[in-house]
């Protein structure tokens, strides 16, 4: 009888946030132990969520730097919703709801971009 042994692999993600005196993020840098990138990556915003199974709630850390522009924030949320639909599909095998999420994200970004044009007079 052959018994297959698995070795565990530890992976880590490090996030460094530089805050101003008012505790507003000036810069966000991150790196991951399994990443091919040699240097820490710069980011202007981050949304990190953990599932608390006891309370059945999401614990979140949402941060963005002072130089994150409103148009970038809209694009960031569009990308998050769009890519979360892929994650949802893989995790639940519910392609129909994942497609609804994608459809919502596409409508969201169209409305956001239209609002930006109206607000900025472009």
Residue ranges and their predicted role:
Residues 23-25, 63, 76, 104, ...:
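Generic ordered-secondary-structure signal
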Residues 26-93:
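Active-site- and interface-proximal helix/loop "cap" or "latch" segments in soluble metabolic
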